[in-house]
Design a protein with these regions (language model features):
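DNA polymerase processivity clamps
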Residues: 1-35, 50-165
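Glycine-rich, pocket-lining loop/helix-strand segments that form or immediately flank
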Residues: 38
Length: 165
């Protein structure tokens, strides 16, 4: 919905029925089914502290993630390998090929490699309008967070994929 609306210029019409809600912006209608039940307590999944907090250009990170994700087929993970001062994104699919690209990042400490579902990582980066994001990580087996660096409150929880050596 946020991507459909131009702030301060578009008017949003909202319609609610017993089992759905419809948002209309200009010629575009977005509908969603209403679900009964308790919303999951995602707050309990959010880690309290992180080993690494890296500020990265959203556009640069997203561009590289999209490009490398093309090689992550058949549930192949997108690998993020952190070493001193850099992040290498890679993916490979047998019989298709592999891709690798490196970004400069303010990483310090022991090298770390973590895997994410490429679609989920790209979706998280596409969901923010911030120029920079802060990637918050603990270790390869714990959830990570993508947070907008502009203080807008954007928060995206992403679960890792266990990597085979």
């Amino acid at each position: 919905l946020a991507r459909l609306v131009e702030p301060e210029t578009d008017t949003i019409s909202i319609g609610v029925s017993a089992n759905q809600v419809v948002f209309e912006v200009g010629a575009v209608a977005l509908s969603s089914r209403l679900i009964d039940g308790q919303f999951p307590n995602y707050q309990q999944l959010l880690p309290d502290a992180f080993e690494h907090e890296l500020t990265i250009s959203t556009e640069e990170f997203l561009t590289v993630a999209r490009r490398i994700a093309l090689m992550a087929q058949k549930n192949a993970p997108l690998r993020l390998a952190f070493t001193e001062g850099e992040l290498t994104l890679s993916a490979q699919t047998p019989d298709v090929g592999e891709a690798k690209d490196t970004l400069p990042v303010p990483f310090a400490g022991e090298p770390m490699e973590i895997g994410f579902n490429p679609e989920f990582l790209v979706a998280g980066l596409e969901s923010t309008t911030a120029e920079d994001v802060i990637l918050k990580l603990i270790n390869p087996l714990r959830p990570g967070l993508i947070v907008s660096a502009d203080g807008s409150g954007f928060l995206y929880l992403i679960m890792p994929i266990r990597l085979n050596a």
